[in-house]
Structure formats: structure tokens, C-alpha cells
UniProtKB/Swiss-Prot annotation:
GO annotations of cellular component type: cytosol
Function: Catalyzes the attachment of isoleucine to tRNA(Ile). As IleRS can inadvertently accommodate and process structurally similar amino acids such as valine, to avoid such errors it has two additional distinct tRNA(Ile)-dependent editing activities. One activity is designated as 'pretransfer' editing and involves the hydrolysis of activated Val-AMP. The other activity is designated 'posttransfer' editing and involves deacylation of mischarged Val-tRNA(Ile).
The protein's name in its UniProt record: Isoleucine--tRNA ligase
Top-level taxon of the source organism: Bacteria
Amino acid sequence: MDYKNTLNLPKTSFPMRANLVNKEKAFLKEWEEMDLYNYVLEQRKGKPLFVLHDGPPYANGHIHIGTALNKILKDIVVKYKTMRGYRAPYVPGWDTHGLPIEHRVSQELGDRIKEMSPAEIRKKCEEFALKFVEIQKEEFKRLGVRGDWNNPYITLKPDYEVKILDVFKTLVEQGNVYRSLKPIYWCPRCRTALAEAEIEYHDHRSPSIYVKFRSKDDPNLYIVIWTTTPWTLPANVGIALHPDFEYSVVKVGDERWVIATDLLETFSRETGVDCSEVVEKIRGKDLEGKEFQHPIFEDKTSRVILADYVSLETGTGCVHIAPGHGEEDYVYGHVKYGLPIVSPVDEEGRFTDEAGKYRGMFIEDSNRVIIEDLKEKGILVHASTITHSYPHCWRCKGPVIFRATEQWFISVDHNNLRQRVLEEIDRVKWIPEWGRNRIRSMVEERPDWCISRQRVWGTPIPAVKCKECGEVTLDPKVIEHFMKIVEKEGTNAWFEKDVEELIPDDFRCPKCGARSFEKMLDTLDVWIDSGSSFEYITTREDHPFPLDMYLEGSDQHRGWFHSSIFLAVAKRGSAPYKEVLTHGFIKDELGRKMSKSLGNVVDPMEVVEKYGAEILRLWLASSDYFNDIKISMRIVEQQTEVYKKIRNTFRFLLGNLEDFDPELDRVPYEKLLTIDKWALGRLQEIIKRATEYYDSYEFSKVYNLVVKYCTTELSSLYLDVVKDRLYVEAKDSLYRRSAQTVMHEILIALMKILAPIMTFTMEEVYSHLHEKDRKYKTVQAEYWPEYREDLIDKKIMEDFEKLLSIREDVLKALEEKRQQDVIGHSLDAEVILVPRNDSVKALLEEYRDVLEELFIVSKVSLSDGSGELKGELVEVTAKHAEGEKCQRCWKYTTEISRSEEFPAVCPRCLAVLKGERK
């Protein structure tokens, strides 16, 4: 007789195949139609707020794997916080001013850009930026990221630009903004100043030369310097020695050379010069103020100064000083000693007339010529090349220079700003903790902030220059007047209107009282734009200052986190964030940086269209994102196998709960079967640990916990064990409903735990739940599963640790018999257990009723003899079970039914078939 139709086999419309790409698009459409973002916020009306403030990505191209990682991480945090009961708004933003966009636009326009006005160029830049805002917006939405996509913040919009100017005005009012001729990072290709945050370090080949400067007092005495920038020698005005270092005066032929004693050996090895004859030893301070012949110009001299930054790591301990081309040179040479600032280089990196014979040469090209000239003069000691880490422009990727120009700066020490920022850093929670020291050291060491850019695409600095006396003025009254114009017309007005319209009617030159001005055309560093976002976003509903969290890559310790805290402390008196969470960078599977030249770039949208966004989200959750993360298409594909295991777990749960009404069929805790009580207790432990991991943002631990739970504890243990009860017992029996009650709890809890990560699949699971389990239109509005300690029976949990250890021994014994062809399925077996001691014997006696189910065998008996497999708690012997195989449940029994109505079944199945087993 075929008993298949008498079994309670799983039934579900939840498909085995995910078809993620199409299914995800359907959910995106559904979410759009239901206005998901506002719907979820409405469900948390009146709840406490959690605000993750979005650091704006740059709108100059499609999203890359790094921006995808960042947005998905934020989405996981926001969705988790929502489920924990917070009202968690998320307003995405875009950074839309600045050099990278202007650079791209200038490439597209070519020579035409030379004939265009600043206003026309700005219009093209705006169109370009807004085009990519829309492109990126759709790409982020495709990743399943929930946000206020209809109302993002965009830094080029007038309502945002006004806030940038408002923050800037405060700094001007407080006296933190000044104009000065100082050496700053300068990109000769982009023809603009750069800030620290716009600098990247890459390997670069440079000349490495040793040059001797002749004393004006003693024609045989020389100081030897070392430099990797020969092109800066025309700007030389001094030589720096450390006041306390010992310097040796070495006899070389008829000459005496001054070199730091500790560097003599290295110098001699690198140059081949014999330095063995030391005629005198002196301190650096002994030479202070001495004049030496300029290496390039016969009519100039170079004065010795003292500087404690001089080190003994490389070179000679004698440093050539050019205040026009170096930060320390400026501080020690110009500020401390009053040496002149010489900077004979124009905005394109070519020498000016001041450089004499080198005029018109590009600085890089001049190195070779200058080295030849030094050689001809007989003062070149040695020349070679080195590869070293060197600053490069973030946009064009070319090497930058230090160049002295008139620029606007923010003083980081005026009004004790730096110290106040450091105090605020200590009040913020940094995740990981090392972030605190990283940003602290950057703030402690940073120079004043160069904030002016010689580009048109940015927020203009509303400074004016008096036509009568040449005084350049940056006045809060002018800024405020301009802000009123910006509110209506945007910052383009600065480039479109006459200067008379841009200043108050009663404004006069503070120096000479004249009323005739011209506009200055510098724009603000884009880090001021994005760093002012706290001022704009806190005007939005549900965005109180300070904001709860900033979450970006670890490079933002010197970028957005850095600019934001300086500006917020200046404007509001405190940090703009309570917590800062950082992630690492994405590398290929060999740990290399991604680059087009290596061909190892992974396009997130390619992954999404091939595998689905869910797989990308799962990959991210599997990664320890606090450190650098590896990705390749092979690594992504591995996640598809994990995804299938998780999906199959949910399919099994849904299939076996198809007839379960959570209100009518739920079994109270005290009536649950022992194994089910254990499984429910384990679920509480899973909920507790998952919550702890989410709270500490350790999503990879959530991933590992859930994957192990699904594969090891559910599929291979609990769900395997209860199959017999689910399929074989009477549909409404306590045996079956007890298992279903716990499986229902597992289904709901597991779905909620995974919802922030697997946002699409858990929405699909939610749509297949019993209608009584669906309180909302979306799983994203559900509340987090409650951890209930009262559902953990400590005795059962402790006892099951031992029982599961015994189960491992039983499985080994069964596998041996399977290999010997004694049994096929485990139900073919009988297991004889020999307890190792009385406490184990008592344990097995107590749980005798659950052992057959737990081991999935036909019979378990206890014995005092010895067993074939020696375990820690028991000895195990497995053999083929006696009797005949029940044709319904496949267990062996010696009491097989001979009934004509229900032949060849065991007593349990016979009772079920007759309706006698409840």
C-alpha cells in the first residue's frame, strides 16, 4: 500500500530557485508604489530617533564597489535600528562642486572651454553633476538601500549653499580666516591649490643629489646638503642645521666638508667619498648666521639657520631651505628667521623671469639642466635616482609641488580651535577604537587649512579687492548680503552679477574708504562644502544636532570626519556626531588595490545584474569590513552557495508551517516536547548573540552565526530530527504542533535577524507568512525579535550539551556501519549505548524517550557491557535493527501491522492512521 498521501509533506509557494535579479526589481517597484521610506517612518512615529548622516559621495561617475559597500553598510545599520524601535530617517546626499567634476567637464569640452565664461562653465558642471546624481541614485536604489530618495541633499542647491556660507561667515566673524603668502600644495596640471585631504601618496622616481655650498668666509669650507627636488635650488635662501646635533668637519682633498657625524658612514657609502679624516667636531648652533654661496646665483647667499625638525634619518643633517616651496622651510626660514619667500614658479609649474636662465622651463624638465649646471660648477657631490612616496593630486594623479601663493586659510589654533576639536574627539565613540588616535594625531599635526581654490566650479569666496588701494577684504557683512542673493539665485550669481550688486550699498574699503571694488574669483575647498552638511541636515525634520552616526571609509579621518568636526566645533561648539564607524578598503582576492590597468575591478552593477543585489549584500555581511576586504567574481559566486543554504532553510520552515495557524495551533511552553524546548532555548541564545553583534556593528559575526545555525543546528540537526514528527504524526497532534510552534518561532526570528542584510529575500519570506504574522506592509517595519530568558530551561540546555556530544559518537558509529554496508539510512539501525559512568547513565535514562528521535534511529538500548566505538561519555555499538521496516515511517519494528486496512506499518503509524494518536 502507498502511504505517501497519508504523510504531512511540506507545501509552499516559496520557490526553491530565487530568480533574484527579476524578483528584486519587482520588490523595488512594490516599495516605490507603497512609498516605503515614509511608510516605515510613519510606523515609528513618536519613537526615539537614530540618525545616521550620509557622507555625500562625489557625483562624477557611476558608483564603484567601494561606494556600494558604504551604502549597503549604512542601509544595514538604519534597517537594524528601525527594527529595534527607532525612528531612523536616512537622507542621502551628494557632493557636487569641485575639481574632479570641473576636470571631467573640461575634458569633454576640450578647447571650447577657453572661449567660455566662468558662468557658462559652471552651468556645464552643474548639468554634469546632476546627471550623475540621478544615475547614482538609481544604482543605490537597485542595491536595496532605503532612503529619502525624493528629497536628498545636494551641495550645489541654493538652500545648501547658503548653509556653507553661513558656516564660513561664522569662521570669518571669529577671526579664524586669513589671507597669506604661504607655500601650499599646488597641482600644476589642474592649476589650483590643494588641501591636505586632496593629496594622495604614490611611489615616484626623483633625482637624489648631494650639493656642497661654499662658505663666504672660508673658501675651503663647505656645507653638504641633500635634496630630491633640484628644481627648488633657484629658490634657496638658507641652510638648516639642528642646533644640538654633532657635525663633523671632514677633510676631502684640500676642502673641509660639514656633515652630521651620525650620517657620515651612510653618506660615504652612497657617494663613494672618503670621510675618514675628521679634522673638527662642532654643534649645529656654532654655524648659526654664517653665510654660504648660493648654488645657482653668484650674486646671492644662503644663510645658516637652526631648526629642530632636521633629522638624522637621511641625507647629511644639513637641509636646503626654500620658504617658497616648503612648509617647514616657511615656518623656520621666513617666520622665525625672516628669510625672503622666493617662489619663481607660475601656476603651470614653469619658471618665471626670477629664475634667470631657467625661465619658461617646466620644473620637472629643469632638474636635468640644474644638475648639469651644478656639475659644471664643481659643487655636485653625487647624483642618483630614488623611488619614494610622494604627494600626488587626487584628481589628475600627477605629482604636486609646494608653491608660495596668496591663499585664504583657516587658522586651526585661533580661538583655541584645535584644542577644542581634540577635546570633542575624546567625547565621540570611535568604532574601531583606533580611529580616535588616528584622527587625534592628524588634528595635532595638521597645518592651517588652505581653503581657496583657483577654479570656477565651487562655492565662491565672497571677497572683494579695492580698486584704489588693492586691499583684499573678506567681510561678514558682504557674506551675509551675498547669502540673501544665494537663497534666491544660487552661487552662480557671484559670477553673473556686477560687483555692485553683490555688496551692501554702504560697504566701503576698510583701509582707504573707497567704494570701487572688483570681485575675487577663488572658490572654497570642497571639504568646506561637505563638512558643512551638519548645518544643512539639522534644518530637516527629525535631524537634531549632534547627529548619531557618521559612517565612512577610514580615509575620512583626514577627510569628511576631519572637516566636519572642525567646522561644527567652530559653528556649534561641539562635534557633529556621537559615533563614528569606519570601514576598510576593497582589494582584489590577492590583496591588491583595484585598478583598470590590473583588470581586477569588480563592477557592483555587473554583480547585481548577474547574481542579484542580495548576493552583494551577503558578501559584505560575510566580510570583516573594519579591515580591508577582498572581492572577486569568484568570491562573490561562493556566496551564492551560502545563499542557497539559507534559502532552503526558509523553504523548509515555510513548507512545514503551511497549515500552522499561529493563534490557533500554538502549543504553550509547558506542553512543548523536550527537544522542542531545547531548540527554543537555542533560538534565544541566537537572538541574544545576534543582537549583541548588531549592536557592535559586527555584521560578519551575525553572518557566521546565522550560517552556522542554518546549516549545522537546523538543517543537520533540529530540522532533520523533527522531520519524522512533522511528516508522520497526526496533523493536529501535540507531537507535530509542538515542533511547528518552535519552527514558527525560528522562522519569524531568523527572518527578522536577516532582514537588515538580506533585505529582498526576507521581504519575500514575509510575503509567504500566514496573514496573522504580517502586521505591516513590509518586513522592514517589523520589530526585532525579543530575547526571552524565561524560554531557556538551563537544565535541558546543559543536558543537551552532553546528549549532542553523545550524538556525535553515535553518528560516527553509524557511518562506520554505512561504510561496511550494514545499513543504508540511519533508520535501518539500532544503537546500543554503554554509559561511562553513573551520571551519564542517569542522563540517558532520563532522556530515554527522546534518544531515538535525536539519533534518527529505529531503536536505542542501554547496556552494561562494552561498545565498539569508545567515546568520552559512552561506548557505542551500531547494528542493523531487528524486525521489519514500516512502510510509512521507515522505522524498523518487531510489531509490524498485519491489518488488511493498514498493513506493514508500525504501531505508532497504525494509531495515527486510525486517528487514535493525538
